[in-house]
Structure formats: C-alpha cells, structure tokens
C-alpha cells in the first residue's frame, strides 16, 4: 500500500513540471520571504524618523562612490605565502612517495652495541665501545692504565673516570682446570658410594 501511495504522489509532483518551472522563471521579481515582526517595527521606526530613507538607499551617492574608488588595500600578511609553501611541500612529498620502492628487501644488520655509533665524539663524552675498552685495559693492567691516563686519552674528567672504574667491571670467564674438575667429581662420588655400600650391608 505504501508503495502505491508513494508512486501516486511522485507522479502528481511530476505532472506538468516543465510548465510550472517556466512560470516560476518568467516572474520578474521573486516573492520575498516574510519578515519578522521585529524587523517590521524597526522599519516603521526608521521611516518615521526619515520618510525618504528608502529613496536614499535606492539612489547612488556619488561622493561615496568616489571615495570607494580611492580605496586601495595592500596586505603584508605572509599567510598566503605560508600556505603556498606548505602546498608545495605537500606536492613534493607526494612526488617522493610515488617513487619506485627499493628492490632490496633484506633485513639490515644489527649494530654491534645496539645503536649507531657517532663518527664524532665531543670532549667529555665517550661511547660504549670506548668505555668497555678502557675498563678492560684497567682491569688487565691497572698500573699501565690509571684513571689519569685514561682521562687524558679519552678527554674525560678524572673523577668521572674514577667512578666508572670503581662501579663498572667487565665480565670475566673462569674456566676451571680439568685436573681440579676431576678431583671435585671424585670427592663428590665417594660419599655416595659409602652411603650405598652401608645401605646394602644392613638388611
């Protein structure tokens, strides 16, 4: 039922639509929208004060027109320039994104210490590689590599180097002697043999 009603209403709206459209277009002046009561009261008050107000609005004022011709607007705002620069940058970025992708798809190698080491080191700083080196040198030969020599070598402050050498150490791998290892295993198995023999003797 609803489809039938909508179909009838649609056909009624489209009936003679061209003639109705021509009649609307042939009107010299469109029908103005209704005004609010407050606007009508303001208009009445204005006409009471100046009855020729409507004529003045419709009449061209030559003095105002001449002043308007002498007005020139010059803008020094850089907003338009910034917008153009941003649009140019976005266009360049789009062109870069449209470049062909690299064909090499292998995973890059990891860095030795987990980060890219800088090529230039400012005075008062050292890399992790340098710190491990002078810590290891000091542990192996403290007399040849004291804190003062390390500070001069790596351009560091001596108290800082002393703190590093005091609180940080490198790992040392200890490999026991094979003879000592065999001795420990023999000593560990002897009590087990004694316990086993005593348990077998006692029913």
Curated annotation (Swiss-Prot):
InterPro entries: NDUFAF4 (IPR009622). One of its GO terms (biological process) is mitochondrial respiratory chain complex I assembly. It holds the Pfam family UPF0240. Disruption phenotype: RNAi-mediated knockdown in thoracic muscles is lethal. One of its GO terms (cellular component) is mitochondrion. Belongs to the NDUFAF4 family. PANTHER family: NADH DEHYDROGENASE [UBIQUINONE] 1 ALPHA SUBCOMPLEX ASSEMBLY FACTOR 4, UPF0240 PROTEIN. Involved in the assembly of mitochondrial NADH:ubiquinone oxidoreductase complex (complex I). Together with NdufAF3, involved in biogenesis of complex 1 modules N, Q and P-peripheral, but not the P-distal module. Required for recruitment of the complex I assembly factor Timmdc1 to complex 1 assembly intermediates. Together with NdufAF3 associates with mitochondrial complex I assembly intermediates during its biogenesis. This is NADH dehydrogenase [ubiquinone] 1 alpha subcomplex assembly factor 4. It comes from Drosophila melanogaster (Fruit fly). The lineage of its organism: Eukaryota, Metazoa, Ecdysozoa, Arthropoda, Hexapoda.
